[in-house]
Amino acid sequence: MMGENRARVVALVVAVVVVVVGVAGNVAAAQAAVTVADLQRVAGSLQMYVDALPQMAKIRGYGFQRGQAVPINLTIGMYQKTWKFHRDLPATPVFVYGQCPDSATFPGPTIMARHDVPLFVRWENHLPASHILPWDPTVPTAIPKNGGVPTVVHLHGSAHPPQSDGSAFAWFTAGFAEKGPAWTQATYRYPNVQPPGNLWYHDHALGLTRANLLAGLLGAYVIEKPEVDTPMDLPCDDDDLHLVIADRSFNVDGSLYMNSTGVAPNIHPQWAPEYFGEAITVNGKAWPFLVVHRRRYRLRILNASNARYFNVSLSNGLPIHVVGSDASYLSAPVTVSNLLLSPAEIFDVVVDFSQSPTAEIELLNSAPYPFPTGAAPGPLNGKVMKFIVQPNGPLDPPDNSTVPDHEVPYASVTALPPTTMTRYIVMYEYLTPTGQSTHLYINGLRLEDPVTETPKSGTTELWQVINLTGDNHPLHIHLGMFQAVKMQQLVNLQAFTDCMTAVNDAVKCNVDQHAVGPVVPVPDHEKTWKNVIKVPPGFVTSVVIAFKLVDTNQTYPFDTTAEPGYVYHCHILDHEDNAMIRPLKLLA
């Protein structure tokens, strides 16, 4: 992403002189310089496939009364503890979610919610006075006056009231001692009114999202709807597994590594445009193994990395049957040989290990980093985990699961009422004269600037997302579900970029005369209602967004117009924190 490739497509070059001495509250700022070679030596010293893949504890997000599912209240805390990422690595200090310190895990417990049964969660901050990782006060950041680690929880992919969205400004420190300007309540309400699917929860504090997630504040969340799920006969129980993938680098003492010096330290002393770890963890273990039998397994794969894309495939060519993406099923399964996941993206897949020609299968990664034009993965970050296939035992139950020939026929984008508004969403990156990234904006605006995206609740909009940077960006829009319908390359890109740099207006810069290049088809396994879409560089990506429930075409059963509103942003966390994020305010 850096250097000439990036320089060709940036929207503006800036030279900013900022003098910052130290990094406030940064306990790691004084660390000796650590090189990539140092990190690779630590990661390379860890033998692959010696730790079994764990499954995180499941918390049922509903109760039962007279045989009916009913709402409940949960309390989930954030704690500092140590976690063993590998047999041969010292225990690592982490921040993690759990119902108590002893049960807190990396990633956090999986919350199993029931469709149309509200869940109330009190999120409590029990973190220490200072962070375990470096952070940068020169990007827009929640900085409490009296110390502490600001946190706030966002349920990614959920339809919920604004007060429960986890606004970046709704942060709070331990014991609610200090609270951000948008903080409203300690208990969040999740109505679970949307279609069944896979979500995840994670930290969303202003300027600290990248550090807080890197430290471990993330976990899976599932909305089940038995009348939809059960008839499909997908693999279930022990054959239904989560794979939460996250790259991490480790210091020699086992602690998590995050850079202490930025790429342009005279501007941002610590911030860097992407974090790439040398070790690949799955469910909190570095390069684990999983023993499977010759039967079908359902794998809910979440890329919880800060910036790394994963293009996963099975080493023996076994096909991957995609049945869902993010928080919805597909209308019918799609079989692929490889699967590209952006950060924050989820794919729900079935793998039939009864068809495996080998007893061992590696899950491989071939995605360049940064994506799409960076370096190819090496022998460490090119491998994810191993499956060890064993024969079925005499006591194993028969495999009655299927890959269904059809799933959930949600309304297609063409069947929805016409879009009520077309908006141009432009992604910019700003560089120093020597080509170092300083910050990223959407439409040339900051999060703190006045809101410009004000859709009406219950409507459908078309967003033309223009990417003038060198990176692919995972776009996440809170509340709404959406899908890319067209990706068209821009021609005469530099001329268009120069015009946009000058006037910041796609219509005045005649975008229609530039958006005439080749059309790249949206992959079939992404043609569903999603929570993250990939926006390729140098393209206009047409995105249809439904600000309503896509399975019923009904408006939300809560007030979407309340404060503090919602946001949309790039889900490369280093970009989101500086500051590729904008407010989204729904109107009645």
Swiss-Prot record:
Residues of this chain annotated as glycosylated in UniProt: N73, N259, N303, N311, N400, N467, N553
Cofactor note: Binds 4 Cu cations per monomer. The Cu cations are bound as 3 distinct Cu centers known as type 1 or blue, type 2 or normal, and type 3 or coupled binuclear.
Reported tissue expression: Highly expressed in roots and basal stems. Expressed in leaf sheaths.
Residues reported to bind Cu cation 3: H204, H478, H569
Cofactor(s) listed in the protein's UniProt record: Cu cation
Induction statement: Induced by phosphate or potassium deficiency.
Binding sites annotated in the UniProt record for Cu cation 4: H473, C570, H575, M580
Functional summary from the UniProt entry: Multicopper oxidase that may play a role in the maintenance of inorganic phosphate homeostasis.
Entry protein name: Multicopper oxidase LPR1 homolog 4
Source species: Oryza sativa subsp. japonica (Rice)
